[in-house]
């Protein structure tokens, strides 16, 4: 539905004899439309402008690359009011537009993500995995999902963990960095696909030199904070034992209560 809304809006903004529009343009418009629903509330009377503004913003961002001639003769509401609404729409989504513009190149996106999350030594491995699966005709959101899946796989292998078990904390961080809206199931699907590639099998287990120490340095701890972190990690490791003990106690007290009830 969102895709069709963007295509309909593009027909009004960049009229052309062709019935097909650049896939990159459509995907970008879809991203703006989807994210605007979380970032920008509109009045009921203004809601019909949302897909139009998302398509308009995508056209503005890619006008030079795609040599687009933008035509705003058929705005959904009077032009003066529309321009005021669109200006605010741009401001709200400016962090997203800047990040998408800066990270349009896949390899740059990978470098950006890994560096942002403190795993720059993983960059070449993530790039290898992404190249193994991504094709030029893929939609932007699918490419972002693949990048995140590749990052999670490499990160897990570097720490010697179960590669196909999603670390949801890391996933959410990565998705936040790339403004990605893929579901956990979609990410997991791509992880399975990538794990079958020979590029993945060639990554050495625990073999990414400096990765673990680098990840630890990204958020330095000092003094009491460091002690709290270490204590937390120990407690986390002991959680299954603690849980079993608690459950055993609960069962014991339940049985005692049942005995008391029977005796009375």
Curated annotation (Swiss-Prot):
Pfam families reported for this sequence: ORC6 (PF05460)
Gene Ontology CC entries for this record: chromatin; cytosol; DNA replication preinitiation complex; nuclear origin of replication recognition complex; nuclear pre-replicative complex; nuclear replication fork; nucleus
Any one GO molecular function term: DNA replication origin binding
Database matches in InterPro entries: ORC6_cyclin_first, ORC6_met/pln
Compartments where located: Nucleus
Presence of the UniProt keyword Nucleus in the record: yes
Domain of life assignment: Eukaryota
Subcellular location, principal: nucleus
Protein family: Belongs to the ORC6 family.
Function: Component of the origin recognition complex (ORC) that binds origins of replication. It has a role in both chromosomal replication and mating type transcriptional silencing. ORC binds to multiple sites within the ars1 origin of DNA replication in an ATP-independent manner.
Subunit description: ORC is composed of six subunits. ORC interacts with cdc18, recruiting it to the ars1 origin of replication.
Protein name per its UniProtKB record: Origin recognition complex subunit 6
Organism: Schizosaccharomyces pombe (strain 972 / ATCC 24843)
Gene from which this protein is expressed: orc6
């Amino acid at each position: 539905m969102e895709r069709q809304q963007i295509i309909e809006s593009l027909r009004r903004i960049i009229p052309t004899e062709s019935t097909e529009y650049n896939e990159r343009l459509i995907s970008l418009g879809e991203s703006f439309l989807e994210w605007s629903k979380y970032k920008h509330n509109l009045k009921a009377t203004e809601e019909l402008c949302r897909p139009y503004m998302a398509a308009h913003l995508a056209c503005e961002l890619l006008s030079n690359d795609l040599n687009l001639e933008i035509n705003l003769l058929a705005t959904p509401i009077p032009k003066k009011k529309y321009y005021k609404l669109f200006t605010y729409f741009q401001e709200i989504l400016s962090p997203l537009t800047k990040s998408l513009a800066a990270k349009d190149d896949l390899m740059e996106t990978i470098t950006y993500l890994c560096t942002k999350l403190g795993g720059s030594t993983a960059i070449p491995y993530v790039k290898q995995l992404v190249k193994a699966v991504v094709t030029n005709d893929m939609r932007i959101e699918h490419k972002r999902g693949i990048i995140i899946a590749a990052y999670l796989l490499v990160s897990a292998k570097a720490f010697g963990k179960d590669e196909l078990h999603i670390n949801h904390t890391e996933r959410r961080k990565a998705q936040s960095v790339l403004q990605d809206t893929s579901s956990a199931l979609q990410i997991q699907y791509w992880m399975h696909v990538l794990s079958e590639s020979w590029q993945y099998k060639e990554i050495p287990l625990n073999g990414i030199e400096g990765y673990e120490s680098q990840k630890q340095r990204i958020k330095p701890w000092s003094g009491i904070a460091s002690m709290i972190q270490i204590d937390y990690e120990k407690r986390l490791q002991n959680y299954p034992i603690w849980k079993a003990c608690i459950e055993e106690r609960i069962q014991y007290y339940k049985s005692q209560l049942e005995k008391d009830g029977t005796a009375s």
